[in-house]
Amino acid sequence: SPVQKEIDFKNIKNIDCFVCHDVSGKYRKNGANGGMPADGVDMKLVSASIGRPSKTNCGACHFYSGGGPNIKHGDLEPQLANSNSGLDIHMGMANMRCQDCHKTSSHQIAGRSFMAPVTEGRVDCETCHGETPHGITGVLSKHLDDHVRTVSCETCHIPSFAKETPTRLSVDFSQAGQDRTPKMDVNGMPDYDKRWGAITWGKNVVPVYKWYNGTRKSYILGDSMASTDNVDLNTPIGEKHIPGSRIYPFKVHTAMQPYDTEKNVLLPVKFRDGYWKDFNWDTAIKEGVKASGMEYSGKYGFVKTQMYSSIHHEVVPAVKALGCADCHKVEAISCRRCHKKAEGMDQPIHTQMVYPDVKNRIDFKALGYEDDPAFIGGRFYLQLGRGKPPK
């Protein structure tokens, strides 16, 4: 927007200290006015109420990104500010602050969203828990630690997200602009908004699992689309044969959004004081294109896009983490398949699903396996030259 163009992000005087350091809870910003303090804020009170950032400070932006509570990320909902251990073990039982993980030096905050264009100062579970977090006791400890080389901690320890506040899963802009009454879904969320179009929501959402090596391929405004069937806006890069790749959980958000049918590129749209003013796509696209410096053929359509958001918050207690049978076939879970003298090692708990209502959680074929790797061999066997596991 024109206001954003005028902001010099390198000028330290443009940093709003109160957003992070106000502890009165009374500070508010005016998003429509370049982020200036909202009218009516008692600046004397706020100026006298300065302290370390709390979860509420961080959440003032991150809990509401996307235009409302938990809309964008899915694993950052307002309840985390006063969490219980069932919602998030770190912020709940341990009462950790955001900066306990997102270490900060000279106001440089480690860790960024998967949707951000760059990542500086990666935040990893291993920083605190190490590479062998399951201990040396217990029959399964070594096997669980073996999984860490292939499966991210979040995959097992965040079985679902958006546990209390629904998150948006899709939006169809092609249906926007209609005067129709929205219906409420099972979570009490509207299935339509004139500004956005048709909307779907999810609660207790099971993630999508993808290989990821810490890099991604992002669509840059102006890039020509290879296909108009399904456009990935930020694809996680990784594969079972690529070193450093591990299986991570993701939220996937899909949309039907405008694109130039002649140039085959996605189109920027001016919404505020643009489309939302008269609901004319052509005019709003022309204004968006002009502001971005792109060219527009004058012909537009709608294309399906999908955006990935990595899941890192809402970690459950260890007893609620995924069990063997939540991912693998029950018939593959037997110690004696490999340990021939493992009398008494097989326990009923090994084949019990912690989340029996979730079927086919892991799509092994989508991850590049012909079948369950517990049967045909995964990294545990193939990389160590063991061949295929016994049947």
State where each predicted segment sits:
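Long, charged, low-complexity terminal extensions
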Residues: 161-391
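Inter-heme linker and motif-flanking segments adjacent to c-type heme-binding CXXCH motifs
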Residues: 1-174, 298-391
